[in-house]
Amino acid sequence: MNVQEKIRNQVTADTVVLYMKGTPQAPQCGFSGATVQLLKACGVPDFTAVNVLADPEIREGIKAYSNWPTVPQLYIKGEFVGGADIVREMYQQGELQKLRSSAVG
């Protein structure tokens, strides 16, 4: 299985998947930590977190998969939602909460 297939399997295996630097309990960058906090603020109690620092192939592969140059990257129901700035904007506009409701509820 190549890295793109592995990523496709990861983003479709769970409803909410976050590619981040570090873990939700110990984020390794401010943007990843902020995205985790926004998910928690939206009432997403459980999500799959993929630590890109643990796997260099995933770290580079996720950028090609989404055609997005940075991490973190949020996926809901297999669809790329965005990075930290987009997730924050969506939260501020109430869009992230709506997306969460349709994904979880």
Predicted ranges, named:
Residues 44-59, 69:
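Thiol-based oxidoreductase modules, predominantly thioredoxin-like and allied folds used
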Residues 19, 73-77:
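Acidic beta-strand-to-loop metal/phosphate-binding motif
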Residues 64-70:
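Thiol/disulfide oxidoreductase modules built on the thioredoxin-like
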